[in-house]
């Protein structure tokens, strides 16, 4: 499972259940965990993730709780930790102020985080980008390149789009970073499809 990245909203549905699920992921040796930092308007996410964000926000999450959870995750688990959020989450929880040893990288959906911040950013690519735009993002990219399988919200695709194929092909030619495909990957058939096209 060295190329598997799983997403979970931090603290969802509650602290105890969240950490029990992390125990299971650790036992299965999941290599990379994308931790969603909740926001009020996760506009590229589908209903399930939107609901999870709302539940965690309603529970009263703040920066101190995020730090405490990240410290526990760092102490108890082996997987790589990628924080995934929006500009709203960056600002609301002052994520740029976090100890950078608490996580391995950060992905911000609607703002480019520069590599010189030391936050080891993961950049997002999609089929609408030009080659110049993708090369510009690669210069700011650490950890891995994240390719959206298509345009739309997570969970909104009735079948896997194929617009990602050109993007994956271009990135593989221009970087040694791993290239992962996300959004709309729901079945074993989907997994096999993206793997067969270089992801």
Where in this protein do the model-derived segments appear?
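Conserved N-terminal beta1-alpha1 strand-loop-helix module at the mouth
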Residues: 1-77, 139-142
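Hydrophobic faces of well-ordered beta-strands that scaffold small-molecule active sites
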Residues: 4-8, 33-35, 79-85, 106-108, ...
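Catalytic cores of alpha/beta
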Residues: 15-27, 95-96, 129-140, 174-175, ...
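Glycine-rich phosphate-binding active-site loops on the catalytic face of alpha/beta enzymes
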Residues: 31-42, 102-115, 146-155, 184, ...
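Alpha-helix-loop-beta-strand connector modules within alpha/beta enzyme cores
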Residues: 46-82, 117-127, 160-181, 185
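Glycine/Thr-rich beta-alpha phosphate-binding loop at enzyme active sites
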Residues: 49, 133-170
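Ordered, amphipathic secondary-structure segments that act as subunit-interaction surfaces
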Residues: 77-95
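Hydrophobic, well-structured mid-protein blocks that either form specific transmembrane helices
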Residues: 91-127
């Amino acid at each position: 499972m060295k190329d598997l990245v799983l997403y979970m909203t931090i603290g969802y549905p509650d602290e105890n259940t969240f950490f029990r699920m992390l125990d299971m992921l650790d036992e299965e040796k999941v290599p990379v965990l994308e931790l969603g930092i909740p926001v009020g308007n996760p506009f590229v996410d589908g209903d399930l993730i939107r609901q999870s964000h709302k539940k965690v926000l309603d529970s009263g999450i703040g920066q101190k709780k995020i730090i405490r959870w990240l410290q526990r995750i760092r102490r108890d688990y082996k997987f790589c930790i990628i924080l995934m959020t929006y500009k709203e989450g960056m600002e609301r929880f002052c994520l740029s102020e976090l100890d950078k040893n608490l996580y391995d990288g950060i992905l911000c959906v609607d703002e480019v985080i520069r590599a010189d911040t030391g936050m080891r950013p993961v950049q997002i690519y999609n089929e609408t980008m030009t080659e110049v735009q993708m090369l510009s993002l690669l210069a700011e990219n650490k950890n891995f390149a994240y390719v959206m399988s298509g345009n739309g919200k997570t969970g909104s695709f009735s079948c896997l789009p194929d617009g990602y194929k050109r993007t994956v092909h271009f990135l593989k030619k221009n970087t040694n970073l791993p290239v992962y495909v996300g959004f709309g990957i729901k079945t074993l058939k989907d997994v096999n499809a993206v793997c067969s096209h270089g992801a």
